[in-house]
């Protein structure tokens, strides 16, 4: 059992784990009851190109809850409609297979409160 903790401070400048891949990285900070992730993707990053080979699935099958810090990206459920998430947006994405890619020439940064543990693992 964990000792009672009144406050626990973590910082992405000193993450507990970093998963690096082509055109980006995923940093994790681990708390007793949850893991929070910070995704940083360079322009040109695409899930199906950069993460698919690491995950063994064609598209992302992780459920997400997060917030976009900067830049913008897509969520594509392969059903014809492509959704856009941009700076300031809070997003929920189901585990239904989806692709994603960075839009434009700005780095995309997002924080993940759900699904971080399983991402790019």
Residue ranges and their predicted role:
Residues 34, 54-79:
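Glycine- and acidic-residue-biased ligand/ion/polar-headgroup-sensing regions
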């Amino acid at each position: 059992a964990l000792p009672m903790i009144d406050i626990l401070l973590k910082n992405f400048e000193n993450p507990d784990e970093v998963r690096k891949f082509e055109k980006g990285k995923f940093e994790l900070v681990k708390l007793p009851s949850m893991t929070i992730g910070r995704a940083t993707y360079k322009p040109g990053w695409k899930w199906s190109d950069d993460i698919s080979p690491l995950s063994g699935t064609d598209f992302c099958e992780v459920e997400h809850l997060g917030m976009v810090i900067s830049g913008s990206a897509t969520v594509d459920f392969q059903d014809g409609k492509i959704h856009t998430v941009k700076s300031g947006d809070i997003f929920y994405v189901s585990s239904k297979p989806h692709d994603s890619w960075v839009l434009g020439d700005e780095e995309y940064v997002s924080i993940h409160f759900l699904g971080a543990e399983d991402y790019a693992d």
